[in-house]
Amino acid sequence: MMLAFLLASAIPADVRAQRGGISYPQLRAQNVAPGLYLDHHTIPAPEGEDNVWMSFRFGYDVLQFRRIDEDNRREEAPQSARFMATAELQVQVYKVDAEFDADRLENQRPFKTLNWSGRAYADSFEDTQQATRFLDGFASFAATEPGRYAYRVRVSTDGTNRPLRRNLRRFMVPDFDKPGQQNLSDEAEEGNAFPVYLVEPASDTSATRFQLSSYGRSVMYAQNFGVILQLPEEGQADDYKVVIERLGAQEEQVFEHSLSPSDIREAGMLQIRPQANQSLQIELLEPEAGNQPEYRLAYLEIPNEEFRNSRFMLKLMQGDKLISRREFRNLWIDIPSSLLNIDVALSMMRIIVDDETFNRLRSGNEAERIRKFYAFWEERDPEPEREYNPLMVEFYTRVDEAFDRFSSLQVPGYETDQGKTYIRFGSPQDIERRLPSDGPAREIWTYENREFIFEATTGFGDYKLVDRRTR
């Protein structure tokens, strides 16, 4: 995919000027996937059976892999595996009250302690660095009574303790026999009396098994997902609606759906089933013969491919009354680094636009710059029905790749002649390297209808564009 059709004139080389005191290299260093995804799920269950399930997922890039020698190869290791990593996780669960004080937990005995360990295998060193490959796990316990709980998490990989940005979380175990009737004096708990489950989209309209989301409190950016909501016993389907609001500086409602009978599912019981790969499924079980359904639920597919990369609040409403809610954020694991900061993103556009356009895009306050940025790329979006813009993503992905491939100690890769050529035209069809005895090394990049000739300026891989030809 070529981006050169956006060019209007020769492009100045300097794109280092940034607003807000942050540079692209700083963003690149900060652009690290979360690595550990953690969530909890509460379900109705017979007395004594587990009704709280913890799911967690480790990205391969945060694990500490070591090479497998034949004398320490475990029986379960695939024959193709060359690297192995271990992870351990401990969850300490506490019963708390509305006046919850985190400091008091230091002297409080846990209600329950859960321990888990697992191993991950990789065939190559490149696989060990993948943020999109995962080691999954789960743990569960029986909460003896409804109410407020908190849990603390400790993680280690290959025996090394790993600090977590947030290792203490609170949650509510509803009274499934009397849903919605808890004394929720703490305003922060409003909307937590009925559970909301984020799931993978159903394969068909009659599905009764759903894969629970494995990304903590997040869903994958630009991918639709499903949601299962428990409904109160009273009221017709069309008494309820689901709304989604985008949170943050540009807060607005982005989705509304009034429930219909086709959205409703009935179940005698809900059950969570671990899968062979350690992920979790939730199943809606039929009532036993002669019994009425115990639970009324709604399933919706959420058009997340239409939503921006942001945080959202999903609410189930009965008229003006809040029944349940669930915050989620879009997770873009491999987001191009420039897109983490509007001014860095705009500065990179100097590579593909003329000076007049560049100066216009960068003028105004932050809200105006964001608006103009989106408008620019929306005009060039090959898939306007989706929020995800593949042309924009391709451009900023090439900026990252140019930085990785062509940077020197003095110049970031996107400012080099080779880097800018790569960003505008993509990977060449062929690269010919010449080492003449009487001159500097040369590289000839060949595309379908043009060639670029680069000449080494130092002995450290720095190349300058010296000629271009149309074929």
Residue ranges, per PLM feature:
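Residues within mature, well-folded domains
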Residues: 43-48, 219-224, 233-236, 247-307, ...
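Bacterial N-terminal signal peptides
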Residues: 1-9
